């Protein structure tokens, strides 16, 4: 992911900083303990697509109810 883009992106929930996890292709918000997927090089910054960081990617379920 482009570092210039990373400088602009923030968590859509708390507006905090995100970190790029290269191994899981996700952006992580440490404050909310959420991981946002990156699909085809595009970050999916929707709360409904995020997973809790306590889950493994294979166990992930959308957070929306």
Curated annotation (Swiss-Prot):
One of its GO terms (cellular component) is cytosol. It comes from the Bacteria. Pfam families: Trm112p. InterPro entries: Trm112-like. HAMAP family: UPF0434. Belongs to the UPF0434 family. This is UPF0434 protein Mpe_A2486. It comes from Methylibium petroleiphilum (strain ATCC BAA-1232 / LMG 22953 / PM1).
